[in-house]
Amino acid sequence: MNIFNQLKQDIIVASRQLYNNQEIANTATIEIPKDSFNGDLSSNVAMIIAAKESIAPREVALKFKEVLITLPYIASIEIAGPGFINFTIKADSWQASIKDILQHEEKFFEIDIDKSRNINIEYVSANPTGPMHIGHARGAVYGDVLARILQKVSYSVTKEYYVNDAGSQINDLVSTVLLRYKEALGEQITIPAGLYPGEYLIPLGQILAKEYGNKLLTMNYAERFKIVKSFAVEKMLDLNRKDLADLGIKHDIFFSEQSLHDKGEIEETVKLLERMGLIYEGTLPAPKGKIHEEWDNRVQKLFKSTKYGDSQDRPIEKADGSWSYFASDLAYAKDKIERGANHLIYVLGADHSGYVKRIEAIVKALGKEQVKVDVKICQLVNFVENGVPVKMSKRLGNFASVQDVNHEVGKDIIRFMMLTRQNDKPLDFDLVKVKEQSRENPIFYVQYAHVRTISILSKARELIPESYNNFESGKYDLSLLSSEEEIEIIKLLASWTKTLEASAKYFEPHRIAFYLINLASKFHSMWNFGKENSDYRFVIESNKELTLARLALASAIQKVIASGLEVIGVEPMNKM
């Protein structure tokens, strides 16, 4: 029995019985109180019903208490504060969670929230101008793990990478590759400021020299540019794909911005918005304070972005008449919606925080308020090596690449560490700390817990084979798991699916890492108690019944840790 789901259903039934209303009760929350003094679980249903029925919340709570106290798994109910209903669950109901994990594993880990949601999540979308740096890895891991979580709770998810292959940075890339091409032909070159001086582009020049000789130099500029652009973008994308694959990340779609121009999708989108009355000719408001010399006060085509909550309307054309980057964003969102997405998630870097309102406006307009949109910002990664910050810049050629860090510590450490802080908070990544074998290193601490559970089961199989066979046959008495430490671990195990659901609901993958660290901590504490007090050991040869129950507990811990690591794309370790 999933206690959280069962209580939610019983609250809905009680709401229908007491107030002939189950829809409002369905929005009520079931949470674990921060203070155990307030019971095992808490619900705000009384306050929600009270607001609707214009009744005092405590009066509503008392009526719920009269109905719910009769449930067989409820030990006690207390009313707290303005009307919170706090539940204490009977120990045997918590203990039964272990049986659910071990004997009904597939059902326990299965979550089905809403199969009607078709989510498109765009993440990484790094400009294809060079190797990915460690800052990109944070958005990559966040987006990939969020996609995994959403798939785990049964949403249909498309993972997408937007290839910015139509902007000025691509022009700079082409110019740099052409210089490297000339260098490969024997010409002395200087990389001007503003281009890409990194040595990673030298092989591209050599490949072009080998394939074309000096033929590119005899072509007209447009023909030469087209060939080099196609070649350079594809090579850089191959590099990025490999970096991502080495992190365990694979997108379903790589979508080209240039294709929006080539297929006329931008013009088509603008015409649609004109028919909707959302494009007009006007001037942008002057910047607040001192007028900036680059402020463009010309009459131009603008999108009515302010109608949907943006701070100002947005230009769709540049001064030279070409489409703005914003116009590409409009067409791209339209394309996603036409492909069937009814929920768009954008994962952006800290340097794009100003894009949130404009993206929301785009989707609200084109989705006609029927398509959900969420824009998540991943803050900076402060990369530290031996305590010294490393500044990263593609243009200067001195950045810590994903490839370098992956080679140094491995993908599992990168993936886990990127989830050790909420995405909208800066994160310090210290190469020294992530390689320590101590409780100060969270990935080691969690993996070590998994290894220890495997060790417990292996030891039991070796020392007490007959009892181990009974354990595998499900012959254990879970009521023997009655110590405070055991019940706390069991409650945490039972809350795994609740944690997964919350991670999906709030788009917070870090909850999974935090949960695993917490579970590992409680398990290690009990293990250490066993060193001081033999009664807390998992394998007690003189007490086979208790050993059987604790083998069940250890196995449940192992399965939940493995499930959590699988969700975040980390391989559970069986030995160290």
From Swiss-Prot:
GO function terms (MF aspect): arginine-tRNA ligase activity; ATP binding
Organism annotation: Rickettsia peacockii (strain Rustic)
Protein's name according to its UniProt entry: Arginine--tRNA ligase
Subunit structure: Monomer.
Chain span(s) of sequence motif 'HIGH' region: 126-136
Biological-process GO terms, alphabetical: arginyl-tRNA aminoacylation
EC number: 6.1.1.19
Record Pfam families: Arg_tRNA_synt_N, DALR_1, tRNA-synt_1d
Keywords: Aminoacyl-tRNA synthetase, ATP-binding, Cytoplasm, Ligase, Nucleotide-binding, Protein biosynthesis
Localization annotation: Cytoplasm
PANTHER family found in the cross-reference section: ARGININE--TRNA LIGASE, CYTOPLASMIC (PTHR11956:SF5), ARGINYL-TRNA SYNTHETASE (PTHR11956)
GO cellular component: cytoplasm
Main location: cytoplasm
Record carries keyword Nucleotide-binding: yes
Lineage: Bacteria, Pseudomonadati, Pseudomonadota, Alphaproteobacteria, Rickettsiales
InterPro entries: aa-tRNA-synth_I_CS (IPR001412), Arg-tRNA-ligase (IPR001278), Arg-tRNA-synth_N (IPR005148), Arg-tRNA-synth_N_sf (IPR036695), ArgRS_core (IPR035684), DALR_anticod-bd (IPR008909), Rossmann-like_a/b/a_fold (IPR014729), tRNAsynth_Ia_anticodon-bd (IPR009080)
Reactions accelerated catalytically: tRNA(Arg) + L-arginine + ATP = L-arginyl-tRNA(Arg) + AMP + diphosphate
Keyword Acyltransferase included in the entry's annotation: no
Family to which the UniProt record says this protein belongs: Belongs to the class-I aminoacyl-tRNA synthetase family.
